[in-house]
Amino acid sequence: MSVDGTKTFFNPYIGARKRSLEARNGLSFSTGQNYDEKNNRRDRNSITYVTTIDEFKYIAPKCLDDKDVKQKGTHIGKLKRSPVLYKNGEEYVFLNFEDCEDVWPRRCSIWNNRSFLPADFDPRFSRFHVYDMIETVEFASAAIDRDKNRFLELLRPMGTIVTMMGITECGKRVAVHVYGIKPYFYMRKVDTDTICGSRCPRELAEKLANVVRSSVNEVANAKRFCTPVTRTVSADCFEVDVVQRKDIYYYGTGHDEFYRVKSQSGKFITLLCDNFYPSIIKYEGNIDAITRMVLDNNGFSTFGWYSFKVGNNGEKVQVRAPCHHCTSCDIEINCTVDNLIGYPEDDAWPDYKLLCFDIECKSGGVNECAFPCATNEEDVVIQISCLLYSINTKQLEHALLFALGACDLPQTFKETFQSSYNILPIVLEFDSEFELLLAFMTFIKQYAPEFVTGYNIVNFDWAFIVTKLTTVYNMRLDGYGVVNQKGMFKVWDAGTNRFQKKGKFKATGMITLDMYSIATEKLKLQSYKLDVVAEAALGERKKELSYKEIPSHFAAGPEKRGIIGEYCLQDSLLVGKLFFKYIPHLELSAIAKLAGILLSKAIFDGQQIRVYTCLLRLARSHGFILPEKNKKFAETVSLTCEEDQTEICEHDSPQEPIHNIKQSSLCHSNSGRTIGYQGAKVLDPISGFHVDPVMVFDFASLYPSIIQAHNLCFTTLVHDDTNLSNLRPQDDYLEINVQGKLLRFVKPHIRESLLAILLKDWLAMRKAIRAKIPESCDEIAVLLDKQQAAIKVVCNSVYGFCGVSNGLLPCIDVAATVTTIGRNMLLTVRDYIHKQWGTRDALLREFPNLSNFMRPEDYSVSVIYGDTDSVFIKFKGVDIHGLVTTGDDMAKRVSSDLFPKPIKLECEKTFNKLLLITKKKYMGTIHGGRMLMKGVDIVRKNNCRFINTYAKKLSDLLFLDDTVAKAAATVAEKPPSFWATSPLPEGLNSFGGVLAEAYTRMMINNITEVEDFAMSAELSRPPDAYTNKRIPHLTVYYKLAMRSEQLPVVKDRISYVIAAATPEVVRDSARVAEFRGELDLCHQNSNTSCPGDSVMTNKETYVRHSPRNKLLISDMAEDPKYLLANNIPLNTDYYLSHLLGTLCVTFKALFGNDVKITETVLRRFIPETFTEDCSYTERVSSEMFTTIRSGIGLQVNEEEETRRKLNIAFRILTATPHRY
């Protein structure tokens, strides 16, 4: 669709005016000064954010043309003028930095290489805080006028610069450029000399340079290296020396000679590790320059305070002139590492700013009810709300609303907003989508918030904005972070490869914390929509506005658009409250600081990288080096894996290489996570309802404590038995059988485990931090609590770090040994308890204070279950109060008698009633009244509220009603077959009453609370990646796509209900069958009518199918809102069966885990009802069957006729001989 040049566009303040339009190809805009159009290249001070435009692509809904005529459709064309916005009736050319000081808040004073700093601006400061870093490679030829000689020398012919971004104590934004960083890797000297024939470091440097030159045109990413400097790279680009180091793998590896190859460019390191004699093992070639700088310098941190000092030889720092700034910061400093002092102990935060934003979109195609898609030109962003907070004070400082067209916020909303936050929202209005998006990006650049949050912004908001600007408007975004060009501003979609677990968004100098991801981690809910999360976490509900209502509201004029604006701002307000409730920035920054990784990596890059960098730092201090992952280190002790294997932590996605780790080094197979050893031991449970006290002993930090106690590590694992010749078994090394393979680990006095050192230091640090919490003020206590939680998270990642064969530094033998020792410990505890506490006298000898709590009945003790790191001990004849008071002493006694430190048992809890079902499934009440459940269906997120409600009512009765509990204990004592033919104890009558109530509720025809019956399941990967597409939540996904509804993204939970098999449901299931496999995820604007246009079906109408044509349950899955809107009945048979199934899984322990008998017994409580099936009656009549009537009210002759028919029928049946 093109725009007629004579068309006018309506603006509420200046009325209709004619715009000069030209339909020329391409956009005419400039991204800054110093652009050489002839040679199509930029100089050293160029920028890639937009500063001037004289023509742009114009996309705007036609409903904005005239406030009286509501047109459908979208204008698409070219508009020749500068982009403008309207604020309070005034027009502003917002790219004109000088004239738009009051349009929105700004923290940027350098724009388009011009300084707008105050005349009295003082660049001096004492300390600065760093929150993000970026690595770049620059050339001396491009810095001649900018840098002093000492920095130029570090760039000849090229050099790596690490830019640290942060803020000073006095609130100035600063970028510190650290010169002289040389990333490096190692190669074993003897192997290198033998394979490549080098005789000295200089000769090796020549060979390295040759490989770089010859490889430039062969590697897939050759364009990154194709510069004149690269083609003429020489040996001077490399610094090679010989050092003494030890390989971290295996005991017996002593100091050996290694070549350390330093390069002036990290890109060369990556290229050489791939292409320089692949048979030579490279060590630490996957470590980037930022990590090198932080780990190689004591006191340096990726998140923390720094100050400057005079260099080792008296060198001083250099302040860059504003015209040479490469970032949007107020101050830029050149320095080297010897000019920096770190303050890792200072945990204070400067006044960082938080942006909380939300976007609203509308479809502009034929079907305006469709959900918008970013690649469709006509689907536009119509509003963006922006709330700006101070992270330190948690105060809302500014509120902006970017709106397409005139927008009048409701007066009551503005008054409430001002009374609550003491500010008014600023509304900025635009004529076209491009102007709105460009203004938003310009605001982002000029305000430069350090932190950004929103709800599902990674998967939708950022993704929509980035896709729209790059595909529809062909804009570069690399200059819209803190750096002015060649920065990162990118979205990674979740599910694009088998490792990535969630979407990513990374922008240089802008840390994104998506509260959707935080909510899914912190809360257990059936749905993670913002409304549900806000109610659960804040006790607040949002004002609902369906995206289907947005087109009509938008077209209705400024007042209705104001309602959309209120909705948009309200979403951001709720997200801001969630952010300061869960304060995710504190814990994640503590993890980043502890692990020595960037905050963005702590957020998006998984668990493996955290342990890897910590181990790298420690290994360096002990003279060890880490090889790039080799398949031999991931060899497994067995290819079998038990059902109850311990879950291993996910490892990092190769989609964006971690520390420049190559994808090939991560993926040795197509099997995803490879777990090649037997999992943690689980002692078989004695199922049933236990009303005697059950004490639970838990191992504190089981796997970390095993690693410490037994000195397990890469460095202590004996790979060559000849290294044991001078060592004594058991005294000098541990020998353990792991699934038939004999493994040996030397003791600490021979060589101390690096993993054990790490864990010991971390746990000591955590203990010290926790000791400070009670003495600290509330604000400091929260910070300390997040720090200790961060340490716990990293500690628990160590075992998984070793156990993932596709991980960064795998050692399956270590992980397998840990689980084997854990299994043996459970068995040892069980045998100890049965032997040492087996009689009343033995128990009282050990713990005489229990004598006052002994009951008259017979005493017994037994271990009824063992679950990885827990032991369940049942005591009969002992009062629970005595066990509670003595439990800690009992746990300490077992620990001291059986295990070396730091392994210890703790008395975690004592059950007074316990329903032990199967492995990893139990529920019970702890002394004190609190109920605890694990693995039980009623707490699963994909159960509906109806089932959860009644299952909870029944479980409450079982544990809180002593009459029911006594009756249930009686049931559990007898064999299941007894209850198949015998009446249940009367004490279970109230139990049956709840079941009858559930049945009665399902039989009510006017069910309106559909949400009570909604279930949910996660869309774990893209729909086309599912092998089985006939599953309920995927069926709903396809139905939403067919109806052009809003489509869930990967990792979203999809809600669904099971509908009755009405004609409409049958029809839609057939359409879904045709639709499957041919889904175009962005084909939203088809001619499909809105759901509201569907033909209504009477809710009493059902369709019967022959068995061969019977619908699957998954085919009857439906979107809850669609079901309610179209008056489709629920499938009551399914829900009753599902309720009974859930109850059977939970309460089968009462009947010896016999599911069939459990269901038979539970069905006794459901009232029998008769529902006449007309179609069945007609079918029977057609087969010559006759109808008879009986009962009160029949006439004498009719009753007599009935008796005669029955007499004949039963006589015939009696006379017919049995033929089988």
UniProtKB/Swiss-Prot annotation:
Any Gene Ontology biological process: DNA-templated DNA replication
Localization (cell): Host nucleus
InterPro entries cross-referenced by the UniProt entry: DNA-dir_DNA_pol_B (IPR006172), DNA-dir_DNA_pol_B_CS (IPR017964), DNA-dir_DNA_pol_B_exonuc (IPR006133), DNA-dir_DNA_pol_B_multi_dom (IPR006134), DNA/RNA_pol_sf (IPR043502), DNA_pol_B_thumb (IPR042087), DNA_pol_palm_dom_sf (IPR023211), DNA_pol_type-B (IPR050240)
EC number: 2.7.7.7, 3.1.26.4
Catalyzed reaction equations: DNA(n) + a 2'-deoxyribonucleoside 5'-triphosphate = DNA(n+1) + diphosphate; Endonucleolytic cleavage to 5'-phosphomonoester
CC annotations in GO: host cell nucleus
SUPFAM superfamilies: DNA/RNA polymerases (SSF56672), Ribonuclease H-like (SSF53098)
Keywords assigned: DNA replication, DNA-binding, DNA-directed DNA polymerase, Endonuclease, Host nucleus, Hydrolase, Multifunctional enzyme, Nuclease, Nucleotidyltransferase, Transferase, Viral DNA replication
Membrane-spanning intervals of the chain: none
GO molecular function: DNA binding; DNA-directed DNA polymerase activity; nucleotide binding; RNA-DNA hybrid ribonuclease activity
Domain of life, per lineage: Viruses
Predominant place of localization: host cell
Pfam family for this entry, one: DNA_pol_B
Family to which this protein belongs: Belongs to the DNA polymerase type-B family.
Entry function: Replicates viral genomic DNA. The replication complex is composed of six viral proteins: the DNA polymerase, processivity factor, primase, primase-associated factor, helicase, and ssDNA-binding protein. Additionally, the polymerase contains an intrinsic ribonuclease H (RNase H) activity that specifically degrades RNA/DNA heteroduplexes or duplex DNA substrates in the 5' to 3' direction. Therefore, it can catalyze the excision of the RNA primers that initiate the synthesis of Okazaki fragments at a replication fork during viral DNA replication.
Self-association and partners: Forms a complex with the ssDNA-binding protein, the DNA polymerase processivity factor, and the alkaline exonuclease. Interacts with the helicase-primase complex composed of the primase, the helicase and the primase-associated factor; this interaction may coordinate leading and lagging strand DNA synthesis at the replication fork.
Name recorded for this polypeptide: DNA polymerase catalytic subunit
Organism: Gallid herpesvirus 2 (strain Chicken/Md5/ATCC VR-987)
Upper classification of the organism: Viruses, Duplodnaviria, Heunggongvirae, Peploviricota, Herviviricetes
